[in-house]
Design a protein with these regions (language model features):
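Bacterial N-terminal signal peptides that target proteins for export
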Residues: 2-10
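Hydrophobic alpha-helical targeting segments used for export or membrane insertion
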Residues: 10-17
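C-terminal motif of bacterial Sec signal peptides marking the signal peptidase cleavage site
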Residues: 19-22
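Bacterial signal peptide processing site
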Residues: 24-26
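First exposed extracellular module after export/assembly in secreted or surface-exposed proteins
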Residues: 32-158
Length: 158
């Protein structure tokens, strides 16, 4: 378990923020961030979550000196036909890098790829159907809408 937690914390900074642009003019997006699920890809014992975002004032991401989190994932298991949120010992909270370092209010949109590693499921569970709900907060603590990954099944190692 110690090794798993160590690998999770080492993986936290591995966040790809690509395709960030400011093609839209200021005021075309609300100041609250808006996210949209794009894809969820499982590769071995880890996974990648892809989503897009817009933010009207560009205060997305945290400076290296900030100590909090701005990306939050809730983990759910399908238990006896009902979705149940499971609080894991090491939560899947992440830090997105600052996209607008100028400090000027400016609309941004982009795509984010989050590496969820090494274990994207609950190793202590007998349930095999999972999904994630995720959201972000900007520097002003505006919370985005919540998005959900599709349901997926895992196969326990034999």
């Amino acid at each position: 378990m110690k090794r798993i937690v160590k690998r999770i914390f080492l993986s936290l900074p591995i966040i790809g923020l690509i395709g960030v642009s400011s093609c839209k003019k200021k005021g075309e997006f609300p100041i609250e961030p808006v996210i949209k699920y794009s894809n969820f890809v499982i590769t071995g014992d880890s996974a990648k979550l892809y989503f897009t975002f817009t933010d009207g004032d560009g205060d997305i991401g945290l400076a290296k000196s900030d100590t909090g989190f701005d990306f939050f994932i809730k983990y759910f298991e399908l238990q006896n036909g009902n979705w149940k949120e499971i609080i894991l010992p090491a939560p899947f909270n992440y830090r997105m890098p600052e996209v607008n370092k100028s400090g000027k209010k400016k609309a941004f949109q982009g795509e984010v790829i989050i590496d969820i590693a090494p274990t994207y499921s609950n190793p202590f569970s007998n349930f095999d159907t999972l999904r994630y709900e995720f959201y972000i907060k900007d520097k002003a603590l505006h919370e985005s809408n919540h998005e959900t990954t599709p349901d997926y099944s895992i196969i326990a190692p034999q």
